[in-house]
Amino acid sequence: MMFELVLFLSVYLFSIGIYGLITSRNMVRALICLELILNSINLNLVTFSDLFDSRQLKGDIFAIFVIALAAAEAAIGLSILSSIHRNRKSTRINQSNLLNN
């Protein structure tokens, strides 16, 4: 019963993240939705690791690597966002075409 609830929560988080990533026009919102997607993947990794082999922590260790990757992605994304905001005075995705100066 708990397994199904966790998978339902993970699918729900993933769907919200995909919907937000597709429909968002703000870069900060897109980064937050990407973090939601990565967190739902982590939830799946830990759940399936516990379900199939509870003695080994392969899914948990891999989830820690994904969390570190998400932190690096957030730091790089926010620094790029800060640079674009400083130059363009906007954080909207459709106004940040850097190829047209």
Swiss-Prot record:
It catalyses: a plastoquinone + NADH + (n+1) H(+)(in) = a plastoquinol + NAD(+) + n H(+)(out); a plastoquinone + NADPH + (n+1) H(+)(in) = a plastoquinol + NADP(+) + n H(+)(out). The keyword Thylakoid applies. Signal peptide: none annotated. It comes from the Eukaryota. One of its GO terms (cellular component) is chloroplast thylakoid membrane. Keywords: Chloroplast, Membrane, NAD, NADP, Plastid, Plastoquinone, Quinone, Thylakoid, Translocase, Transmembrane, Transmembrane helix, Transport. The keyword Translocase applies. GO terms for molecular function: oxidoreductase activity, acting on NAD(P)H, quinone or similar compound as acceptor; quinone binding. This is NAD(P)H-quinone oxidoreductase subunit 4L, chloroplastic. The gene is ndhE.
